[in-house]
Amino acid sequence: MHKRLHMNPIWKKELVVGSRSMKMSWAIMGINTFLIIVVLIMLSITNMSAATSGYQYENLIWLFPILGCIECGLVSLIVPIITSGSISGERERQTLDVMLTTPVTTLSIAVGKLGSAMSVVMMYMITSIPVMAIAFVLGGMSWWALLGLFGMLLYLGIYVGSVGVFCSSVVKKSVVSTILTIAIGVGIIIVTTVILYAVIATQSAMCDAKGVTYTGPGAVAFIMMLNPYSPIVDFMMRVMMGTGIDRLLEEMGTKSSIILAISRWWIPCSIVINMIISFVFLKLAARNISVTRNRK
């Protein structure tokens, strides 16, 4: 006999509840409408410039990165809104106590809440394929680029979603949880960027004072691997220019073959690191839920 596929019960419940609501349909329609408007604006700008300088078809190549960055931004906003109210929302509806009486583990609860948010992301990605296909017709992008972008969106959704579930397990109000989730994400981006640029500025000033050539930030550049958006930047650079962050470090004067070799694998290295961080956030969320269960 064939074994039945086991599905996370929390994930299954969220899918059933979500399928009965029109909110997801309206949200997906709104997102795709926004993407279509962006495409129409870019085509209008190209047509207007054609009157003076002729059609600049090479400008349409930027359709893909612009749409891709917009999608990443939307995922960064939508997923926190969904996940930041996952646990705190159950508290507000006073249904968390009932959920904790079931044999479902607290980690399964956290993973199920994240999985339901990722289902929304996957639905959003699938419905955006017709809009993104315009970048293939006009911008000359390949299907591999689209698959890579979808992989980046899934990775970003998991990272941001795990932070949202953690924040939702810490605070009691969904609004506060949403703000805290966005604040943590923005804080990570700002801190890693500021540290890198501070090191670069300091090293560059010291090299100028000594009259020697600046040889790049060195291993400090790897702190940007903690930035969840750095793999997306590397991916876009490789799609558009054929080179990634490794080339950028080389142009900054980096001579170390080890640093350059590691930076060529920037995307997988950064994704693995951030997925480990995501798992830690989920474990912490499960621990916080366990504390709530033990108090009952």
Protein language model regions, located:
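Secretory targeting signals
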Residues: 65, 73, 116-172, 180
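Long, hydrophobic alpha-helical segments
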Residues: 63-89
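Short, charged cytosolic
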Residues: 1-7, 91-99, 121, 150
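Membrane-interface alpha-helices at helix entry/exit sites of multi-pass transporters
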Residues: 105-117
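Transmembrane alpha-helical segments and their membrane-interface loop/helix boundaries
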Residues: 1-73, 160-169, 175-296
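Transmembrane helix boundary and interhelical loop/hinge segments in multi-pass membrane proteins
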Residues: 79-100, 113-114
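Well-ordered mid-protein domain cores that form the structural environment of catalytic cofactors
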Residues: 73-74, 81, 97-100, 105-108
